[in-house]
Design a protein with these regions (language model features):
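Acidic, low-complexity/disordered tracts enriched in E/D and polar residues
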Residues: 1-46, 50, 96
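Long, charge-rich, low-complexity alpha-helical segments
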Residues: 37-100
Length: 100
């Protein structure tokens, strides 16, 4: 399967926060933020996170990255797929197909 055709949704047990000029993801466990697993996002990570909505395919987000950050499509794809792999590994996102 073409990885760029996948769609993801955010795990409801992860909170996104902007603090000053920094963006973070905090997993919630037992109704408490698990501060040992805070994930800091750079500008590209924040941009991607804000566009994960359960509807957009990764190819759509890749195109947005190319437009927003003036990078070439292969570089945008590489960065996007690496970030998505990191988020999946930490269970911060779920493939939409996995919900069905």
């Amino acid at each position: 399967m073409d990885h760029l055709k996948k769609s993801y949704r955010k795990n409801e047990d992860v909170v996104f926060r902007r603090i000053s000029d920094e963006s973070i993801l905090v997993p919630i466990r037992d109704n408490v933020g698990d501060l040992a697993f805070i994930y800091n996002l750079n500008d590209v990570g924040t941009f991607i996170w804000e566009r994960i909505d359960g509807k957009r395919q990764l190819v759509d987000i890749q195109e947005m990255l190319v437009d927003e950050f003036d990078v070439n499509p292969p570089e945008a794809e590489r960065d996007l797929l690496q970030f998505i792999a990191d988020l999946e590994k930490m269970s911060f996102i779920v493939t939409v197909d996995d919900d069905r």
